[in-house]
A protein has these predicted regions:
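Short, electropositive, low-hydrophobicity segments enriched in small/polar residues
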Residues: 91, 149, 192-195, 209
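Flexible, glycine/small-residue-enriched loop-and-beta-strand segment within the central core
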Residues: 71-80, 100-110, 115-180, 206-207, ...
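Beta-rich strand-turn-strand
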Residues: 171-195
Length: 218
């Protein structure tokens, strides 16, 4: 008997161009327009995503997390020291708050006088670089990790993120993999920046779009 794989979703196009999902008990479906195949999640899980050295550093950083998370709020120097111990490049007078999440310190570079606020999430599977005088407001999310959704094994990708000097990532904003936020730019509250942001521009919305230029008046 033929071996059948688990059900997968097939998209079937109707005469009215509406799209409706149906279940097809095969590992591969071919119709007049598209070919569909299942994700090979087992291969994805077997793939070696981290080196042995990086795995060890992740374990040590997890164990050290309470020293960061439960440090008193004003102890910015202590948190700078702790991040440097794990390979981060941290400039002078950097303020990183204790509820912020730094996923992999050795993939972090922060310029002088930058602030990373409460509950900000720095998911730096790939390198994330902050210039000088950057402000990252509370609950902002910077994601330097994604997957190649065109391949069956769903491989992990780590595109770097760069936040240039004098930029501001506002509350609840999202900056996606591979994005460069230009000098002095502002990513507005809850904006979703999946493309580069021009210097001295202000972007808002989802997807982020430029609303106006930023001017600093002395």
């Amino acid at each position: 008997m033929p071996v059948r794989g688990p059900p997968i979703a097939k998209i079937r196009r109707s005469e009215t161009d509406n799209w409706t999902p149906s279940l097809q008990s095969t590992s591969r479906v071919v119709d007049s327009q598209f070919t569909f195949a299942m994700l090979d999640i087992e291969q994805n899980r077997r793939a070696r995503k981290y080196s042995s050295g990086e795995m060890m550093r992740r374990v040590l950083w997890t164990l050290a997390q309470p020293l960061f998370r439960f440090s008193p709020r004003p102890c910015f120097g202590w948190r700078r020291f702790l991040l440097r111990c794990f390979g981060a490049k941290i400039g002078r007078s950097v303020h990183i708050y204790p509820s912020a999440t730094i996923y992999l310190p050795w993939n972090l570079e922060v310029g002088d006088k930058t602030a990373i606020g409460e509950h900000a999430f720095v998911y730096n599977l790939g390198p994330i670089t902050f210039g000088e005088r950057v402000t990252v407001s509370h609950r902002a999310h910077l994601c330097a990790g994604t997957h190649d959704h065109t391949k069956a094994d769903f491989p992990l990708l780590r595109p770097p993120i760069t936040i240039s000097s004098d930029a501001w990532i506002c509350a609840d904003a999202f900056v996606g993999p591979g994005v460069i936020v230009g000098e002095g730019a502002i990513v507005g509250a809850r904006a979703v920046a999946m493309k580069d942001v021009r210097p001295w521009s202000i972007v808002v919305g989802n997807p982020a779009r430029e609303s106006k230029r930023r001017e600093i008046i002395q």
